[in-house]
Every structure is written in structure tokens, then in C-alpha cells.
């Protein structure tokens, strides 16, 4: 058994486990996500075998007391072939770190990964109540930690987000557009978005992380600052995703990318 450990945010945990799961499937090794054994209880994986608090506690303290080894995947572009040999040979071990990457295997087992992270029925039912006809645009506004992420490069103002949304609207002049705005800014100026996007219906779902991700996954297009949250939301249905790398850049349909490309180009 390979116990996958991480302390990051939900979407990062999903991607990290996806890589280890895919490697395990390819090499007939069972894997278990320590994170989803007790946290972010929105997904099918949380109800599968081994994903429970007892398994989490066992792995945590067995590693802490040195009873099972821990492999750290912390260095980008490092050669982890020795680690892979240990993952093949050792009966029990813990793996941790963000730099585990098996892109081809992830894509090979992507359908299974999506099924593991299928949203619970209650989450889907909540989302269904918010969905309306028309072209659904999901917008993820990232603030908070983005003040320091890459030196604040992707910390955009409301004016910049609205400008990008307007560019999207101009690409679809004959469509009725629903704009679903999610994010981590509790002080977001909602009235500003409603006033500036008066030709669209603007919805602020106020969901938890699982509900927000589920809602975004049911949109037709996604827009946001580069983030694993929108990336994973796009994974479920191969949605076109526009990462705002330069808010002044003219928007075109060609600038939208899908998960299979973007997950290999994470910031």
C-alpha cells in the first residue's frame, strides 16, 4: 500500500493523488489518499476502501515513528527512478510532495481518476438547482494567497476581471450568458459585477469548495487566474479554460485550452 500524503489545497491534493493513483494502477500497487480519508468529503473517493480516519491515523503515526519510510517528491525535474523502485518493492510506504509527475499515465487513467473524484449526490443536487439555460461561463476569482503567489502577478482587480468577462461576451454576441462567479474573496464587490455586466445574469453561488468546483465543472467555459482549482474543474468534461495570464491580451477562442494541455503547464 502506498499512502499519499499532502497538506496543500483541495485541487492540488486531487492532482497530486491523480498522479500517484495512475502510477499505482500501471504497476499494480494500491494507493490511498490520506487527505481525502478525512478532509474535503465531497467526493466518491472519500467513501471507498481504506479512505477512513483509522487508515489515516495509522499511516500518519507509522511514518512519524519511523515504522514505514517516507519518500519526498519535492524537487522539480529530479530523477525519481530510485523512488519508483522503492515504490515497487516496499509493502508499505508514504509518499509526499508536489513534484510527482507521470503525465502519460495520468491521461491513460484519467477516466478512472474522474470517477474517483465524482461529486457526491448531495453536491450534484445542490448544483442542479443553480443551473439555468443559456451559455454558462464559470469565473473563478482568486485573491488572498494570490497577493504573494508569483509576486502577486495574478492578483487581478475587479475591473480587470470584468474587462475579461466582457471580452468573452463579445465573442458570443447572440448568446444569453449566465456568469457564475466563485472565489475566495469574502469582500467581493458583487454590485459592481452586476452593474458592469448588466447584459448577463450574474450568479454568486456562495458554495463550499466542493460545490463551487462542481458548479464550475457544469459550465460551458471557464475563466480565471492560473490556478489548479479551475484546472481540475475543467478536467471533468474537458471544458475550454482561459487562464488570465495578461488581462490586457485580446481574447480569442483559440486562447482557451483544455485540461490535457494545461495540467502539463502549471505555474
Question: Where are each of the predicted segments found?
Answer:
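Donor-binding and catalytic core of enzymes assembling or modifying cell-surface/extracellular glycoconjugates
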Residues: 10, 170-245, 251-252
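Gly/Pro- and small hydrophobic-enriched strand-loop and loop-to-helix capping segments
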Residues: 25-34, 236-267
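Short, solvent-exposed turn/loop segments enriched in Gly/Ser/Thr/Pro and often Arg
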Residues: 34-41, 183-184
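Secretory-pathway luminal glycosyltransferase catalytic domains
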Residues: 39-176, 259-261, 267
Amino acid at each position: 500500500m502506498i499512502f499519499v500524503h499532502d497538506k496543500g489545497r483541495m485541487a492540488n491534493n486531487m492532482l497530486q493523488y491523480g498522479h500517484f493513483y495512475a502510477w499505482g494502477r500501471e504497476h499494480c500497487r494500491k494507493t490511498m489518499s490520506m487527505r481525502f480519508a478525512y478532509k474535503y468529503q465531497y467526493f466518491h473517493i472519500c467513501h471507498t476502501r481504506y479512505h477512513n480516519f483509522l487508515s489515516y491515523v495509522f499511516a500518519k503515526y507509522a511514518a512519524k515513528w519511523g515504522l514505514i519510510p517516507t519518500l519526498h517528491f519535492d524537487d522539480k525535474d529530479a530523477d525519481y527512478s530510485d523512488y519508483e523502485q522503492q515504490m515497487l518493492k516496499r509493502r508499505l510506504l508514504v509518499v509526499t510532495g508536489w513534484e510527482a509527475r507521470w503525465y502519460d499515465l495520468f491521461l491513460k487513467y484519467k477516466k478512472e481518476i474522474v470517477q474517483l473524484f465524482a461529486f457526491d449526490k448531495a453536491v450534484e443536487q445542490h448544483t442542479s438547482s443553480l443551473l439555468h439555460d443559456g451559455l454558462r461561463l464559470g469565473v473563478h476569482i482568486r485573491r488572498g494567497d494570490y497577493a504573494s503567489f508569483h509576486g502577486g502577478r495574478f492578483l487581478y482587480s475587479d475591473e480587470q476581471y470584468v474587462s475579461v468577462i466582457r471580452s468573452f461576451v463579445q465573442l458570443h454576441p447572440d448568446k444569453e450568458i449566465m456568469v457564475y462567479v466563485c472565489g475566495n474573496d469574502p469582500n467581493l464587490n458583487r454590485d459592481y459585477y452586476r452593474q458592469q455586466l448588466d447584459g448577463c445574469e450574474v450568479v454568486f453561488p456562495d458554495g463550499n469548495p466542493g460545490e463551487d468546483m462542481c458548479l464550475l465543472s457544469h459550465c460551458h467555459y471557464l475563466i480565471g487566474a492560473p490556478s489548479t482549482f479551475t484546472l481540475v474543474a475543467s478536467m471533468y468534461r474537458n471544458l475550454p479554460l482561459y487562464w488570465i495570464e495578461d488581462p490586457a491580451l485580446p481574447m480569442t477562442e483559440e486562447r482557451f485550452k483544455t485540461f490535457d494541455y494545461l495540467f502539463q503547464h502549471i505555474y
